[in-house]
Each structure stands twice: as structure tokens, then as C-alpha cells.
Curated annotation (Swiss-Prot):
NCBIfam families given in the database record: hscB, PRK03578.1
Subunit annotation: Interacts with HscA and stimulates its ATPase activity.
Annotated protein name in UniProt: Co-chaperone protein HscB homolog
Gene Ontology MF annotations: ATPase activator activity; protein-folding chaperone binding
UniProt entry keywords in alphabetical sequence: Chaperone
InterPro entries the record matches: DnaJ_domain, HscB, HscB_C_sf, HscB_oligo_C, J_dom_sf
Stored Pfam families: HSCB_C (PF07743)
Domain spans labelled J: 7-79
CC annotations in GO: iron-sulfur cluster transfer complex
Record lineage: Bacteria, Pseudomonadati, Pseudomonadota, Betaproteobacteria, Burkholderiales
Family: Belongs to the HscB family.
One Gene Ontology term from the biological process aspect of the record: protein complex oligomerization
Source organism of the structure: Burkholderia mallei (strain ATCC 23344)
Length: 175
């Protein structure tokens, strides 16, 4: 029997690894939700309703974490005792720092020129960058290179943040 303290992977009876089959995760989530959804306990006592609500909340949190590759990687590292350190560890390899500066300059230039096409192109480039970095992250996690994976997570967080900024710039320029 799974307890509230078990891992997200245990909750859905999935192996604790980065590569997940999304349809399998979705089916496991629906199976758990069908068992613990508060509507099933509408006629139950207050204690049972409260427990059902805890389980439903736990299932939702676990599902949201596992379906997002970046959150899943961070969670896997947490299970391994590795803190990604996104708040206080901003150390990045020099090549990535140079890439960051280039992206920032391109965003600034395109936004200054009100060039939505250039921003769209950069956003597409960052999507490709994200895909490649997720593949690298998976390989690092699979090989047990947890510190390398933690740095890859921090880099991906930056890529996602910049992508969101570009999306916001495009939105502003189009309206």
C-alpha cells in the first residue's frame, strides 16, 4: 500500500527515472484520482473526506511534477539528495554564459526594432535548445552524473525564463 510519504513515482507505480511514458503516467494518474477523488466520499464522514482531499491533492501535485520534465528532473535529484540550488547557485559554464549574453542582445535588438519575426525566430531556436538540453539532462541523470544534471537543470530554467520573456515581448509588440 502506498502512503502519503512515498515518492511521486511510487504513488503511480512508475520507475523512478527521467524518461517517462506520458500516456502511462496519464493513465496512472486517472486510476489514482478515480480512487481518491473527493466526490467519491461525499457521503463519508469528515475524517474520510479530509483524507480523500489529502490524497487527491497529493496525486495532483505528483502528477504536475512528473509531467513537467524540468520539475521531474529537479524532483529526481531531490530524491537522490541533490539540491539543484537554483536560488543561490548561479555558476554556469563560460560557454553557456556567453550564449546567455548573445540571446539577451538579440532580444534587446529585436524588441528595440519592434521585430516580431526576429523574436519568433529566436523563440523557435530556444525551443530547439530546450529539446537538446532535455535530452542531455536525461543522459546525465541516467548515468548518475547528478551534479552535471543539477547544472543542466539550472541552464534549462534560464532557457525557459528567457523563452517566457520573449513570449511576453511578442505579446506586447502585437498588441
Amino acid at each position: 500500500m502506498v502512503s502519503l510519504k512515498d515518492s511521486h513515482f511510487d504513488l503511480f507505480h512508475l520507475p523512478a527515472r527521467f524518461a517517462l511514458d506520458e500516456p502511462t503516467l496519464d493513465a496512472a494518474y486517472r486510476a489514482v484520482q478515480s480512487q481518491v477523488h473527493p466526490d467519491r466520499f461525499a457521503a463519508a464522514g469528515d475524517a474520510q473526506k479530509r483524507i480523500a482531499m489529502q490524497w487527491a491533492t497529493r496525486a495532483n501535485e505528483a502528477y504536475q511534477t512528473l509531467r513537467d520534465p524540468l520539475k521531474r528532473a529537479t524532483y529526481l535529484l531531490h530524491l537522490r539528495g541533490v539540491d539543484v540550488g537554483a536560488e543561490n547557485n548561479t555558476a554556469m559554464e563560460p560557454a553557456f554564459l556567453m550564449q546567455q549574453m548573445e540571446w539577451r542582445e538579440r532580444i534587446e535588438d529585436a524588441a528595440g526594432a519592434k521585430n516580431v519575426d526576429a523574436l519568433d525566430a529566436l523563440l523557435a531556436e530556444l525551443r530547439d535548445e530546450r529539446r537538446a538540453r532535455l535530452a542531455k539532462l536525461g543522459a546525465l541523470l541516467d548515468s548518475g552524473s547528478d551534479q552535471g544534471a543539477a547544472e543542466a537543470v539550472r541552464q534549462l530554467m534560464f532557457v525557459e525564463r528567457v523563452s517566457a520573456e520573449i513570449g511576453a515581448q511578442i505579446e506586447r509588440l502585437e498588441h
